[in-house]
Amino acid sequence: MGFFNQALVFLLATSFLSTPVLAQQDTYDYIVVGSGPGGGPLASNLARANYSVLLIEAGDSSTQGNSGQYPPQITWDFFVKHYSDEKRNMMNNKLVWKTTAGRYWVGAGSDKPPAGAKFLGVYYPRGSTVGGSSMINAMCTWLPPDSDWNYIANLTGDASWGAANMRKIFERIEKNNYLPKGTAGHGFDGYFQTNMNKPGSIGQPVLGIIQAIAANFSKPTDAASITSSMGSDANYLDPKRDWTNGIWGLPTHTKSNGERFSSRDYIQDTIKAKFPLTLSVNSLATRVLFSTTTCNNQPRANGIEYLQGKSLYKADARYTGSNNGTLKTAFARKEVIISGGTFNTPQLLMLSGIGPKEQLEQFKIPVLVDLQGVGKNMQDNQEMPIIGQVSGQTSGGFTQPIIMMTTPHTPDGERDMFLMQGSFAFRGFWPSNQTNSALPQDGPGTYGISMVKNHPQNKKGYVKLQSADPREVPEINFMLYEEGKETDMGAMKYTIAWARKIYAAAKGITVAAKEPPCPSGPDAQGSCGQADEDWITGQTFGHHPTSTAAIGKDGDPMAVLDGRFRVRGIRGLRVVDASAFPRIPGVFPVVSTFMLSEKASEVLRGEAGDDICAA
């Protein structure tokens, strides 16, 4: 008996949980695991092509609107590390512990948490409801540089991945609510709704700071020109876009009435229209099932095993361990598609015997395919605010102006820094129900310029199993600045110095640079040297994980997928979510993931009649 067949027999005969009763009536053309921006549109598109589809979602169908908060009914609470060095991990000022009473406590690594509190790490929320993280994100809709799509085209040798074709895909899915119909590069009849607030009168300190930025870019500084820039379209069609510094408005995935649009809306519309889409909520996928027969000596996926029940995953704050769920199976006539997201997709692959051999053997998981790239190559946009203290009257809150600029550390000549700003300090994420009453709060006059690094060079992050139990959360470490440090941290340091000079040059308002702190005072270029580097090391955060099941070249041992989303070494199994990107697309990957999903829909519809064992 061959190696694959031995592993298949073992997987079919055993389970971490128990052997389920097979229900052959639970058979569909396709099974999609995950309802976020990758899986939700794909499942809907396949159903609209009249294929029967089962869409499995581990969360329920709770909603929250536009609040940007992370209530437990729609959020999984992941806690991650940034470094392998615990000393650097403890430099962060917003770490999380769990007290003996089961409550979160947030503080700096140098603080003293309550006695007996368990250290958790850096808070990293993910959406866990129908719609996935498109239900909890900030809705920023910023198209990636063309080079990110062309990179995939070059890797795969498939020109349909190129920027020109991917822009056509964007035009097809977009339903633009803020531009005149017919505007080049945009769509007006799709399902993916976009909108942008029009700026009104601009008060201080925004006006004075934006005027200083405009002057720095040699742009007009009068209020009318500033207002016009803040209402301009950042996703305009222009071959020079990715090299152009300037000021724009912020498009979001929102409806014409300002409400959040998410993949949930498209799923609901598909079901309401009576297409053959079955949505199963509170359904935690535990492993992929495989046929007893192989395709050309490769395992063939033919179903999913899952637990049905509420709050079964340990990242759910409501998890108690008292509910074991009901073990179920479902089968696919054609294919299984995993869209669980950057953390959970590699976890499910590994639980199914697909991943680094040494990890699987550690937890006695039979190895179907030794795919070393599963769970590796994880990337994120580095983020951090530069905070000022404004003297005098201010108009507070989040404001519209978005800056894209090129630093001397750009790896390819393209813009490498995205900046949003306003009377707030966006220092990252921590549970809103935390119990540390002494946690420092920002007072009146706080102003922040928040960095999001474009084209980050670090690809050393990872997701690893901690157990063969599918309810257990994996180990997650972003390994920040492990590679490409000179480029990534260099751009961050440059932007800090630049922002200090912008604050000093603000028109009609006094703004004192406050954070990162610079005890000795900045030099003539605005830099504080090693102090800035130490602050960046401690306070960098992110919330755009990608690339843990990446598309790659044939022959690359780290490539998990081919250019048609197929898991290498397996038949009938694909991955369609942000984990598939070989490098992080732009500064906010949500719109790119919707586009990826549409691309996958094209591929699957085109291959639906093919013999799965022939290709």
Regions found by a protein language model. Give the residues of each.
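N-terminal redox-cofactor-binding region of secreted/periplasmic oxidoreductases
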Residues: G2-A615
